[in-house]
UniProtKB/Swiss-Prot annotation:
Phylogenetic classification of the source organism: Bacteria, Pseudomonadati, Pseudomonadota, Gammaproteobacteria, Alteromonadales
Name of this protein: Threonylcarbamoyl-AMP synthase
Entry similarity comment: Belongs to the SUA5 family. TsaC subfamily.
Main subcellular location: cytoplasm
GO annotation, cellular component aspect: cytoplasm
YrdC-like domain residues: 3-188
Length: 188
């Protein structure tokens, strides 16, 4: 498995690779959100049903506008999300019609976050787009907290490990439905 810095990962992701990378709290698995084959590979590696949907993580909201249907959100709803970003808040927002079912699962929405983690931000900036994000673990197991855990669990299953440090957060992000304002999961 390749071990690379965020700036070196672009070609792997854009060519359909699945990567593991450090985030605010745990290691994540990610891929190109516009490549269904890569998303299916990620889901198979994680043993996660496609129906559950995935998260998109970005360095800025402008990277999410191709996926999120802003017309279904009020200015106040968007402002609330913007007031929490970048940071440990994931918002469930309505999707545009072309968004892959592998991303949104059985839902008419997708979970999105603008990350404050420098490594995640560098990845998204290098890609020029968001990254699919899900915790680096098999469904139902604890997520990986170290590069060694990634190497042990995913050797031969993913294409690269992004070098870097986890953030200081030890709780998952808070998830909020952007339309209703309802907290779906309390995090940090």
């Amino acid at each position: 498995m390749l071990q690379l810095h965020p700036s070196e990962i672009k070609d792997i992701v854009l060519n359909g690779g699945v990567i593991a990378y450090p985030t605010e709290a745990v290691y994540g698995l990610g891929c190109d959100p516009d490549n269904d084959t890569a998303i299916q590979k990620l889901l198979a590696v994680k043993q996660r049903p496609w129906q559950k949907g995935l998260i998109l993580v970005a360095s800025e909201f402008s990277q999410l506008v191709d996926y999120v249907d802003e017309s279904q959100l009020s200015a106040e709803q968007l402002e609330f999300a913007f007031s929490k970003w970048p940071g440990p808040f994931t918002f469930v927002m309505p999707i545009k019609p072309h968004v892959s079912r592998y991303l949104c699962g059985e839902f008419d929405s997708i979970a999105v976050r603008v990350s404050a983690h420098e490594g995640v931000r560098a990845l998204c900036q290098a890609l020029g787009k968001p990254l699919v994000s899900t915790s680096a673990n098999l469904a139902g197991e604890d997520p990986a907290l170290s590069g060694d855990e990634i190497l042990n669990a995913f050797e031969g299953k993913i294409d690269a490990l992004v070098l870097g440090s986890l953030g200081e957060q030890r709780q998952p992000s808070t998830i909020i439905d952007a339309r209703s304002g309802k907290i779906l999961r309390n995090g940090q």
